[in-house]
């Protein structure tokens, strides 16, 4: 059982919508006017898996669960849209969709984006509609995470690739226990909704049980989650001296962890996030 599952209750779509609209009201990440240092690094480290694992052809569509990344500055699925592919996003929050839509229009990419207001536990697509399906930090927020794997599988063409990112309970920097602490003091729901944490074996076995082949597990975002939170908090004050000090002090630390992560060693399985790939 993934860590944290006992804390979950079944959520209706309306409850999930209220939760994520509430996150928007409190999140300083969603109100940033420019990417933070770790936003750029997060995006670069995630995109390397698209390059490694996916080869979608022009005319094929990509599916992404939730639109949070595109409503902030990590913008993972821009990788596909900037290469001429259409991306369907499924998100339960009208607010997040509107924020992402404005960003995409400003970036000249909205013609390739197709947001759908829906619950990603029950995808509204015909089977075999997509060449690639992906989710990053999505399915751990719902108890029916196995249903989400099955839904992504069904929506993907035979031979298509499904990529899923989930929090890592084995994270060296104790992401799970940091979330437990934030939950205890009542701060977690202002940043995100409750989330499950997985071991590499759990998410690998879940993909195999869902019928995927060629399953591969890796990790991404090796640097401390606490530095990520600090970076995002400081980004609220881009013109203050604290932001300039952050750039001088944090940049070399993040660069060191990025170099280590790109060496693709077993240390990646201690990263903040696990990423798993399976082929339908």
Region locations from a protein language model:
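Conserved class I S-adenosyl-L-methionine
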Residues: 2-58, 79, 96, 108, 161-186
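Class I SAM-dependent methyltransferase SAM/SAH-binding core
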Residues: 61-122
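A conserved beta-strand element that flanks and buttresses the S-adenosyl-L-methionine
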Residues: 134
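Short catalytic micro-motifs in class I SAM-dependent methyltransferases
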Residues: 137-141
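A short glycine-rich, Lys/Arg-flanked "PGG" loop and its adjoining helix->strand segment in the class I
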Residues: 146-161
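Acceptor-substrate binding/catalytic loop of class I
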Residues: 185-202
């Amino acid at each position: 059982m993934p860590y944290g599952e006992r804390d979950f209750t079944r959520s209706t779509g309306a409850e999930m919508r209220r939760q994520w609209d509430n996150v928007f009201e409190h999140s300083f990440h969603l109100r940033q006017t420019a990417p933070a240092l770790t936003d750029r690094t997060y995006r670069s480290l995630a995109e390397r898996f698209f390059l490694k694992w996916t080869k979608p052809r022009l005319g094929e569509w990509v599916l992404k669960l939730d639109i949070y990344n595109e409503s902030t500055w990590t913008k993972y699925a821009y990788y596909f849209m900037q290469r001429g592919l259409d991306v369907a996003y499924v998100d339960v929050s009208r607010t997040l969709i509107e924020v992402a839509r404005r960003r995409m229009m400003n970036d000249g990419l909205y013609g390739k984006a197709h947001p759908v207001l829906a619950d990603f536990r029950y995808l509204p697509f015909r089977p075999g509609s997509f060449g690639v399906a992906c989710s990053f930090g999505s399915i751990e927020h719902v108890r029916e995470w196995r249903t989400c794997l099955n839904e992504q599988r069904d929506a993907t063409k035979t031979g298509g690739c499904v990529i899923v990112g989930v929090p890592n309970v084995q994270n060296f920097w104790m992401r799970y226990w940091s979330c437990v602490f934030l939950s205890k003091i009542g701060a977690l729901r202002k940043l995100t909704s409750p989330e499950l944490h997985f071991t590499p074996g759990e998410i690998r076995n879940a993909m195999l049980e869902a019928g995927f082949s060629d399953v591969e597990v890796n990790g991404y975002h090796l640097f401390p989650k606490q530095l990520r939170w600090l970076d995002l908090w400081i980004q609220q004050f881009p013109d203050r001296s604290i932001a300039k000090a952050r750039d001088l002090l944090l940049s070399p630390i993040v660069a060191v962890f990025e170099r280590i992560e790109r060496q693709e060693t077993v240390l990646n399985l201690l990263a903040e996030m696990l990423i798993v790939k399976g082929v339908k």
